[in-house]
């Protein structure tokens, strides 16, 4: 099974002009996107809560969370974001993908438009 990456922008929803380009690993098993904390701080995005998460190996970790804007292929969405710590890779999670209207095709390892439902 391969790894899917995308180039997307992250920004503070209160300051739309300043954006940072990142390479995200698309993780269809992750509910939320993760961006390194230093980038979120640079954009003025502040955490509003701390949540516990379980990793694939069973370890339990805690991470700060906030709200960030994301842009990909001209689509823009706002979504919860995890503040990544040192060593954490930028991840694009399902909540953000659905906000864009995309889903990961597991066979072709690419993003495809999804059928939107109310």
Named regions from a protein language model:
Residues 1-118:
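Pepsin/retropepsin-fold aspartyl endopeptidases
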């Amino acid at each position: 099974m391969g790894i899917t990456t995308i180039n997307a922008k992250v920004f503070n929803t209160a300051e739309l002009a300043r954006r940072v380009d990142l390479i995200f690993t698309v993780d269809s098993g992750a509910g939320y996107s993760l961006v390194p904390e230093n980038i979120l701080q640079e954009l003025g995005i502040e955490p509003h809560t701390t949540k516990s998460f379980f990793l694939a190996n069973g370890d339990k970790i805690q991470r700060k969370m906030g709200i960030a804007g994301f842009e990909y292929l001209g689509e823009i969405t706002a979504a919860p974001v995890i503040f990544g710590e040192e060593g954490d890779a930028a991840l694009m999670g399902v909540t953000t993908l659905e906000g864009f209207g995309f889903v990961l095709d597991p066979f072709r390892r690419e993003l495809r438009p999804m059928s939107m439902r109310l």
